[in-house]
Swiss-Prot record:
It is found in: Cytoplasm. The keyword Protein biosynthesis applies. Pfam families: PCRF (PF03462), RF-1 (PF00472). Belongs to the prokaryotic/mitochondrial release factor family. It comes from the Bacteria. Gene3D superfamilies: 3.30.160.20, 3.30.70.1660, 6.10.140.1950. InterPro entries: PCRF, Pep_chain_release_fac_I, Pep_chain_release_fac_I_sf, Prokaryotic/Mito_RF, RF-1. It comes from Flavobacterium johnsoniae (strain ATCC 17061 / DSM 2064 / JCM 8514 / BCRC 14874 / CCUG 350202 / NBRC 14942 / NCIMB 11054 / UW101). One of its GO terms (cellular component) is cytoplasm. This is Peptide chain release factor 1.
């Protein structure tokens, strides 16, 4: 393991030198990539230092015990040895997880799209509940959220809502939320008290930079229209809303959240770029998932991933068989237990795949 960590230390020193070079700073793509790598391995370099200290403590304690000339020093050395031997396997496990190659997309900001599925008005209300859940979670993580586009439901919630999330390691945290979310509850409009099942689809798109995806504007049809509010009524008389259609793929992105037509066009282009990037990413994830029979990252955006059962106060994630009877807090944004479990399973899969390294 020390050999592998030595390589990490060499790479860290190399990057530390590179990111202060003027030619690197002037190359936006390279600088950003190196900066992300620097942040990613800094914690690992610190763990390496701790690992070296623990190994040195074991050697030192063994020497003192073997010498045996000072009884008091021997007792202290035995305590030091026990402490170091307890810490060593923990530290090795932590380092193994940190050595797992990170997806380069994990550090990216995201576009989250929530669409009401089967279930009519109730599905729209549920889409609104999911939107609230995610924005609350983002708040606790210190991330910023910004609505890009929305289409409100007739009885509340959203037929569709798209919002941007910016912060640290956003995609790496939220990527496993993509898929079909199902709710089982008695709708507000239900007079007979019957439980209905509705669904909403969540898409999590890593935000693509201009250098990730080149969009030829000759392939894009641009339409301008008036922004609309609830029920479709026009909320302004200027055509500030923008719809972009990517002709080769048929993908459509629009934005009407900003008052400025120029800003709406920029945001719509950002969504379009992210959707094109995600298409390629989904293919790659599907191939990777087949290789390692992944539980949590199938690349299948139509897979039912989670059920929210209100009568039982239960949330079940079907991919990892996790059931929590804490629906109230979860719907209020406390989804960290679910996120952590999904990340753990994904890391265990990667660790198994890369086990020959260790």
């Amino acid at each position: 393991m020390l050999d592998r960590l030595q390589y990490v230390k060499q790479r860290f020193d190399e990057i530390s030198d590179l990111i202060i070079q003027p030619d690197v700073i002037s190359d936006q793509k390279r600088y950003k990539s190196l900066n992300q790598e620097y942040k990613g391995i800094k914690a690992l370099v610190e763990k390496r230092e701790e690992y070296i200290i623990v190994l040195a403590n074991i050697d030192e304690a063994n020497e003192i015990i073997a010498d045996g000339s000072d009884a008091e020093m021997v007792e202290m050395a035995k305590m030091q040895l026990d402490e170091a031997k307890d810490r060593l396997p923990e530290l090795e496990e932590e380092i193994k997880f940190m050595l797992i190659p990170k997806d380069p997309e994990d550090a990216k900001n995201v576009m989250v799209e929530i669409r009401a599925g089967t279930g009519g008005d109730e599905a729209s209300i549920f889409a609104g509940d999911l939107f609230r859940m995610y924005t609350k979670y983002c708040e606790t993580m210190g991330w910023r959220t910004s609505v890009v586009d929305m289409n409100e439901g007739t009885s509340g919630g959203f037929k569709e809502v798209i919002f941007e999330v910016t912060g640290e390691d956003v995609y790496g945290t939220l990527k496993f939320e993509a898929g079909v979310h199902r709710v089982q509850r008695v709708p507000q409009t239900e007079t007979q008290g019957r439980v209905h099942t509705s669904a909403a689809t969540v898409m999590v798109l890593p935000e693509a930079e201009e250098f990730d995806v080149q969009v030829d504007m000759n392939d894009v049809r641009v339409d301008f229209f008036c922004s609309s509010g609830p029920g479709g009524q026009s909320v302004n008389t200027t055509k500030s809303a923008v719809r972009l259609t990517h002709i080769p793929t048929g993908l459509v992105a629009q934005c009407q959240d900003e008052k400025s037509q120029h800003k709406n066009k920029d945001k719509a282009l950002m969504v379009l770029r992210s959707r094109l990037y995600e298409m390629e990413l989904a293919k790659k994830q599907e191939e990777d998932a087949k290789k390692r029979s992944s539980q949590v990252s199938s690349g299948d955006r139509s897979a039912k991933i989670r059920t929210y059962n209100y009568a039982q106060g239960r949330v079940t994630d079907h991919r990892v068989g996790l059931t929590l009877y804490d629906l109230g807090n979860i719907m209020n944004g406390d989804i960290q237990k679910i996120v952590s479990e999904l990340q753990l399973v994904n890391n265990m899969e990667k660790l198994k795949e890369a086990s020959e390294v260790y």
